[in-house]
Amino acid sequence: MPFRGRRRQSALRGLSLAATFCLAAGSSGISGALFATPAQADPLPTAAGLSINSANLTVEVSADFPQALSYTETSSAKHLSGARTLASSITINGTDQPVKVSSQKADAQTVNYLITPNNLAGVSLDAQLRVEGMTLTFKISKIKDTAENRVNNLQIKNQDLVTVSSQEPGATVASAVVSVDRAVSGDTITNLSSTTALDPTAKRSMLAIAATDQLAAGFETNSLYDSGNTIGPSDQGKFWRQALADGTGADGKPAVKMAVSSGAWLYRSAGSDQTEELPWSKVVISGDANADGKVDWQDGAIAYRSIESKPAGGDDVKNRVVTHIPFNFASQATHPFLRTLDDVKHIALATDGLGQMALEKGYTSEGHDSANSDFGGNFNERAGGLTDFNAMLSGGSAYGATFGVHINNTEAYPEANSFSNDFVDPTKKGWNWLDQSFYIDQQRDILSGSQQQRIDQLRSEAGPNLTMAYVDVYYESGWKSYRLQKGLKDAGFSVASEFATAMPANNTWSHWANDEKHGGSNNIKAGTQILRFVDNSQRDIWNPDPLLGTSHIVEWEGWTNQNDYNAFLKNIWGNNLPVKFLQQQQITSWKSRSVDLTGGLKVTGTSLADRVISQQGVPVLKGSNYLLPWSAAPVSFGSGAVNDTTQNKLYHYSADGGTSTWQLTPQFATASSLQIYKLTDYGRELIGSVPVVNGSVTLTAEANQAYVLVADASVTTVPADPSYGAGSKVKDPGFNSAGLKDWNATGGAAVERTAQGLLVAKLGQGSSAISQTLGSLDPGSYSIGAWVEIEPTTLTVTPAGGAPISVTVDQSGAENFVASDEKRGTYFQRLRVLVDIANAGAPQLSISAPAGEAAVRIDDVRVVKANKVPTTGILSENFENTDQGWLPFIKGDAGGQTDPRTHIAKLNAPYTQKGWNGKTTSDVLDDTYSLHSHEENQGLVYRTSNYTLPLQAGRQYRVSFDYQASLANQYTWVSGYDSGKNPVQTASTAIPVATDTTRWSQTLSAGSCGPAWVGLQRTGSSGGAEFSMDNLLVEDLGPSAETPACASLSLTSGQDVIEQGQTNTFSASFSSSEAQSIAGLSVALDLPAGWTASAATPATAATLPAGGSLETQWKVQVPADADGDYTIKAKASYQTTVDPIGSRSATTETAVYTLPKPPTKDTYASDMQWIGTPSNGWGPVEKDQANGEQAQGDGPPLKLGGVTYPKGLGAHAASSIRYYVGSQCSAFTAVIGIDDFQKLKGQAVFSVLGDGNSLYTSPVMKGGAAAQTITVPLNGAKYVDLKVAISGANNGNAWSDWANAKFLCSAPVAPITLQPTLSVPTDSLQPGSAFTVRVDQLKSGSTAKAELHSDPIDLGSVQANNDGVASFQVTLAQDAPLGNHQIVVTGTDKNGLAATGTVDAQIKAANPNPGTGSNPGTGSNPGTDPGTGSAGGNSSGGGANGSGANGTYVNGSGGSFGNGAGMDAKTGSNSASSLAETGFSGLVLPLGIGLMLLLIGAAAIIVRRHRHS
């Protein structure tokens, strides 16, 4: 068929053109689709004499192309095939280029090649094949190109480094990629056979191994892809393989072969003139490397280690037994660098010197997520700056500790020195917490040299014991990732990252892999046996394994609120030490229930609970009990580190405790006895000596307690004197030494170990003190303080030759809410004095308390150089020299015990200031620093205390400060007092918008109810709420004329938003803290004009007892025209009943806003106001960007199916967003799906609800699946909820996009005119008739009513079904009025609007002489002018019976075979079609002619038979 042939030719031509286009357009990258089955050539003959060889290996190579044809092991003469087809082209810039090749054998081991593309003038490549040992290396040593013909990338797709075939026994190709879905292995092991499926295109992997039963081969390459190439992520395109037909095997079955080739090489990135490393690949050949009597992929994996490009710092991994995260955040400096050094020493003593990696999160600027794109040059001064940082590094090395830092090369914050309009893209927002970050232009960063300069600056400034760089939130792959890794590696850093998939070439530690709270089971650790076989000791990124285990991190230094040192230690002993013991050796054989390793190690079992680890045949671990040999030599880290691995001590641990007997390994079995030490906070504690009997020892252990055993007591690991406080001017500032040996303690003061295992000093119940002569201080001002859990306590500093300076406090209601502080949840706060040292010398420090039952605890004494702020009042603060924290303010309860969103902001004009990138306010108001709150959590943001700002009872004060506020009524200035441990708020004043620096001034009187305080509260919930403060001044105005109330008053709204024209509820809560009862209590509201209120419950009380409360519910009527934001105030007034008797009042106010006006045109959901605050599974819901992280505005662009959407909502399951549309919108439209950012991860179910009723529910939407476009009728809903539900076991990665979300509201929706219908002709009704009235387009579940008019007769009420249909079953009464009527139906239409519809109805008298035909007619159109005859004719066939027509005609439907189209009642003619179609409805029948009746009956039968034949 020529036509079909032409169509096929056209289709093929289209495919060819499409492929050509892809090749041309893909010049800057390699597409996976381009590796189709290559053209096959005849098998290559071995070129005589063209072979190269080492002492171990002979390789036959092609003279016509740099391909190995075969490998022969010299000692065994065993053989492995190389290429079986001749390559004749190289893919350059995505296009296959035919080439000419010449070759020359340079020496016995080397052949050189010159490769010249036929069609690229001026381009040539020098290449080489060289064999050394058991390894063949292919490399391109030179690329020559021209400006017109640049070589950007290249690939030899069918170089076929090794080929195995199903014709060879044991033919296998094992490959691996990094899979972080715990349920999905990253391994593919292909055992080639005649049934192996052929591959239409190549498959790719990060690692590949080929084997037969003779030899195995491992491969390495520097394959690299440009960033943005889909093959690049997780280095999954390093190796290509493809199952192809290989003729017919000896058994007559089809044979299948598979070859392994390198992936593509990148020479120049798109837009770059810089060239990358020249391409190379390697093949290493191996026999039975693990001596298990067979050759398989595991032998190739062992051999691969000899050519592997190992991760930088990989050799350090096995000695990083203890990983911990000292955390500094938001200017709090809770872990100064010298404090961390002491913690490192403390851990070393508790673990007898196990190797540590201390990862500093917050070493820059104001701490974590502050200017962390500044790798160097911006060290956290409040934590000690560069000097103390390097002291920490150098001091930690003697205790087996090395350090890492948390850097960010994805996002930058405006405060960073590196920040600029060129450095970032100001339109792309990133993480948003303390500040809004912006995504770095990484290509420019690389090409400008900025990235490497920042790396080099860190390397040059920090000491050599900084060995690791943890790269946060790094998503890039390919070239950008390679250049960052290379820069860090060249600078001597090992690489770690948040994700196990990031930077896989060098990633040695993944946070999500070690801390299982992150990521969910489908995005957490690397699940691949092959990669772990190779690199088990080089990385900590692995899935849990029942034999090998996996490393974990359990924190205690404030990261993610963790503060349990006991749990930290338990993780070391119960999990990490056995993992690291196995990592000391390399895996050699891995079976389902056993793993063999070098060093004589073997693991057997089925789970961690029953596994046994043996060394040299001796069990050293049984389940959760062990006696592990270890080296006592201090460990060192970094490039060139050499560690003594001699096993000369033993670690003993039993999870449950008890007595156990252990056979000793040969190193210890000959000893006569072993010294056993219990490990404590202070190091080794000698328990005694245990005899060695027949090479065994019997030990008794406490549960979860670690011990060390040595044959020689002189074998130690940790220095005897830890010298706590070195460099800090305070000896043992954290009370880590036993017995307060560096302090003068009196009155029973001692060290206490808290329930979390933290060490503090505790003063005795009698008069008690601790004191110390500090280190010598140079002249100047100093802040000297300590963390104190306060009851009456005095901190005194006496300078040498000077007068004592002290501060005394007796109580505090200020709970510690700082999540980064181990003391969170307690009432520890920092107590300090500012001291001027006139003459150099050593001051005396004393912390004392009088006798009392309440405990006083002390920790972290610190001396910091400071500058006093001059004041004209009792206190001034300009935040220019704050030593740590936000003094005089401390964090309040906003967000609870969490990381605050307030910090001391640093000027970096113009980026931190008003006007840049749409900023409406400045972060910094004066000089260099201001206190800045960024979109803070609701609650008390910060407050003073009686020791940061002492306010005396009975005096009046003025508090003033400079401020800017981006929005009105988002923050309030509050004051109150502490009643015991409970802060009581007594006054609140909303802060108006101020986009220029404005002076705030307010007076308050301090009462006798408790210590007075002032502070900032976040009351609003709007995004973009900024508040900056500077130049705080507190002045004493003298005695107060008023006595403040000892009471609190709060006011809350009972609804998210105020509904206009409706009654809204408010609740006022009054609580008295007066010492005695009060009288005449009255609570009143102060409302905006036009608003009215009535108390639904009592608002007055004649008396109220001490500590009593009054709750008043208010009904507030809001005018229909109210619109916008309002402030509702409340005031409580009462009289005291004991001295001082008088009137008291407490006030408060709350900000509310009214329902937005419903849209009147099509409106994007992201441009509309939410009702309340949406709930969301991760961070906040985002507008016009995807979900992002924990802060507003930190998501990437919305992207579904490769399409970027500028408008929409970014949510995360489980999520709920409410809108008010006021029945004015007909439909909601959106494109829904899981954002492309999550790739194949995440799943969720979307739904739309109107007024609480389900309108739409999606199927399960999964990452990587196609998005869906939805249009949902709203059926008149007033409120619309957009919900996303969790699908599956967890909601990890469920970034749920409502892209292009829009409400269709182009015009006000008019009520639908209902169209009721009857089940019978409308003029056929008679008294007593039964019929159905049906009406549709109603709102599902609504009630409709029917009436007969004009004399209304109720026909009933019916509820519409799910399809919006109501059916009324009606039977007319016998006395129903005759004549013309209307049936009127009223109800609610599908849009929720009141609707009406009518249908005419005629009720006639019953026919006194009805026809008797057996099949009465049902014609739907009996004519419009009926005759007057009294009866119709009879029909015995299929004819019809006229119901009152003139006797000159019959109207009918012709029985069951067709409907009459109606007839003219006067002429009897029928205007319809054929006889069969009209059913004789127009046939004239003269009266009295019976024959005709018979003919009609017969004809009806005939026609009926014809219709159904």
UniProtKB/Swiss-Prot annotation:
It is an enzyme of class 3 (hydrolase). GO terms for cellular component: extracellular region. Residues 1479-1509 form a propeptide. InterPro entries: A-galactase_NEW3 (IPR018905), Endoa_GalNAc (IPR025706), Gal_mutarotas_3 (IPR040633), Galactose-bd-like_sf (IPR008979), GH-type_carb-bd (IPR014718), GH101_dom-5 (IPR049314), GH101_dom-6 (IPR040502), Glyco_hyd_101_beta (IPR035364). The keyword Secreted applies. Keywords: Calcium, Cell wall, Glycosidase, Hydrolase, Metal-binding, Peptidoglycan-anchor, Secreted, Signal. It holds the Pfam family NPCBM_assoc. Residues 1407-1428 have a biased composition (Low complexity). It is a peptidoglycan-anchor. PROSITE patterns: GRAM_POS_ANCHORING (PS50847). The modification Pentaglycyl murein peptidoglycan amidated threonine is found at residue 1478. Its EC number is 3.2.1.97. It is found in: Secreted, Cell wall. Residues 1176-1197, 1403-1439 are annotated as: Disordered. The active site is at residues 472, 498. Probably involved in the breakdown of mucin-type O-linked glycans. Specifically removes the T-antigen disaccharide (Gal-beta-1,3-GalNAc-alpha) from extracellular host glycoproteins. This is Putative endo-alpha-N-acetylgalactosaminidase. It comes from Renibacterium salmoninarum (strain ATCC 33209 / DSM 20767 / JCM 11484 / NBRC 15589 / NCIMB 2235).
